Amino acid sequence: MSNETNCTLDFEQSVELFKEYNLFITAFLLFLTIILQYGYATRSKFIYILKMIVLWCFWPLNIAVGVISCIYPPNTGGLVAAIILTVFACLSFVGYWIQSIRLFKRCRSWWSFNPESNAVGSILLTNGQQCNFAIESVPTVLSPIIKNGFLYCEGQWLAKCEPDHLPKDIFVCTPDRRNIYRMVQKYTGDQSGNKKRFATFVYAKQSVDTGELESVATGGSSLYT
């Protein structure tokens, strides 16, 4: 007699297993749906951070499953496919960390490790505060606004701010470039004429270099003139 045990599930066992864990599966899928659908920095920072954590977990999970597939391949063809996919997952994960670390060295912001983007916007206020925000791509124009004394850019709340705190230049950093935006227009005041209550600023892309924000912050007061 064979001592091997058949570990495969038949249809009825699969149905029973689903019935037993269907509540957990429903809750898990609902959690993923909410995270992926509503996880935007402009809506809720908390849900957005949860979304980032979920995305971070996907790469190690893919690598782990790939390694298991290499250890227990269904056949020779499956082994080759598992090796290729696992190597691709490992290279992609390493590439993500390399690019994120390069971006972090350039702008010193934890947004550098955002798996959705390889760009970070930075506004160095004249009061010494640095405001960083997530941005999906390098735009041609940036339009930060001040509403009720709070600074917003790309729909994201950044800091408590007054109109005269905005600098002449703001930046969007990528792993290999620093994009410089210069203020070209400024509108202050609301319908009541209160210039501190509402303000709109227009920054146009001026130049591109390979500098870091730290060199700008310590380079003198010319940035704020």
Swiss-Prot record:
Changing I34M: In strain: Isolate GA/5381/99. Keywords: Glycoprotein, Host Golgi apparatus, Host membrane, Membrane, Transmembrane, Transmembrane helix, Viral envelope protein, Viral matrix protein, Virion. Residues 1-20, 73-77 are virion surface. PROSITE patterns: COV_M. It is a multi-pass membrane protein. GO terms for cellular component: host cell Golgi membrane; membrane; viral envelope; virion membrane. Component of the viral envelope that plays a central role in virus morphogenesis and assembly via its interactions with other viral proteins. This is Membrane protein.
